[in-house]
């Protein structure tokens, strides 16, 4: 808590992707990625940031942690996160045409974001509504199904889904 009620704590992470065909101005802003199709970037955010955040929450909850940054100090949690992000990364690279090396940098950026001790995020908040997160078009089930459609077995996503179900039962 901060003495100033208007104080807002933010993180240095940002990503600004704009559909270039919708942009009428010839002016190009620094730090903005102009793309023809936003859908791969929307999926990348869902299958990397959202799936990753939830993976840390459910893995961390099982280990008894209360915050995301606290859970990220546990090598077991980080190993599970990396494994899940590499599985979803295979899908994003195959489907969205992302460069493998660039996607690896994106994964590292996400991991660094979750390790930020100055942005405390409660696992209880991130892990709430587990049934919604197991929806057909959500962060776990959709990439799991789509990975099997390209003959990839999503072992770590399945393991995380088990953790979500375990959390649901408590």
Language-model segments: what does each one mean?
Residues 1-169:
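Substrate/ligand-engaging "lid" and interaction regions
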